Regions:
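Short, conserved "switch-loop" micro-motifs in signal-transduction and mechanochemical regulators
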Residues: 99-100
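C-terminal output helix
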Residues: 103, 121-130
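Acidic, metal-coordinating helix/loop segments flanking the phosphotransfer/catalytic sites
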Residues: 42-60, 64-68
Length: 133
């Protein structure tokens, strides 16, 4: 799968920036559609996500732990979380995952995540968490 970082509406700079790190293109599109109050930037892997962090400094990040090359595990997602917080330590990261939810939630919060959301994604619930940030 090619690396991507896609802006939903780059011409509107008044909206807060939300970085969605998710390797499922369908879920990326759904989140872009659901969060019109934000300028949504989507990244599908760690490399593109960290490039966006350096360039755009998003206000909020949602992070799926199951990213390539380890989509069935959590190692790449946690490495991405650590990279995000190394670049911008005060970034509010909401981790969303279905992998070992309780253990992953504890680890994510211990590493500095703002919150944890267990998949499958409910757009309204995740939107509420993102809006709290």
């Amino acid at each position: 799968m090619p690396r991507t970082a896609v802006h939903s509406k780059p011409d509107d700079e008044d909206r807060p920036v939300l970085l969605v790190i998710e390797d499922d293109p369908g879920l990326q599109r759904q989140l872009k559609w659901a969060y019109e109050a934000y300028e949504v930037i989507a990244a599908s892997d760690r490399e593109s996500a960290l490039a966006v962090m350096r360039d755009a400094r998003p206000d909020v990040v949602t992070l799926d732990l199951g990213l390539p090359p380890d989509p069935d595990g959590v190692s790449e997602g946690f490495a991405t979380l650590e990279g995000i917080l190394a670049i911008a330590p005060h970034t509010k990261v909401v981790v969303a995952s279905g992998h070992g939810a309780r253990e992953s939630a504890r680890r994510a919060i211990a590493l500095g995540a703002f919150d944890f959301y267990q998949k499958p994604v409910d757009i309204d619930e995740l939107g509420f968490i993102v809006s709290r940030v």
